[in-house]
Amino acid sequence: NEIQELHAGLNQAFNLLRANGKICVVTFHSIEDRLVKNFTNKVCLRNKKTKLIKPSSKEILSNPRSRSAKLRVIMREQLNFNYIPISELGFEL
């Protein structure tokens, strides 16, 4: 299941990051983006507004498939990180 894989990947990547390290996640579907956004809200204490980058109008004209893409940049603020269960992100398996 793609949602489970994304969830596991976010937890593993964040566990490997040092403090102030950043990861970038590209999503193409709203359900994936919701999981990434909810994960971000759990791990980012100070800066709840993460960097969200959407394709420009020019990019969409030259590449119509890009219109649904969202790039989120997430920074690890703390040294300690605890695994976040998928149920805490609003998803049930």
Residue positions per predicted region:
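S-adenosyl-L-methionine-dependent methyltransferase catalytic core, i.e., the SAM/SAH-binding region
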Residues: 1-93
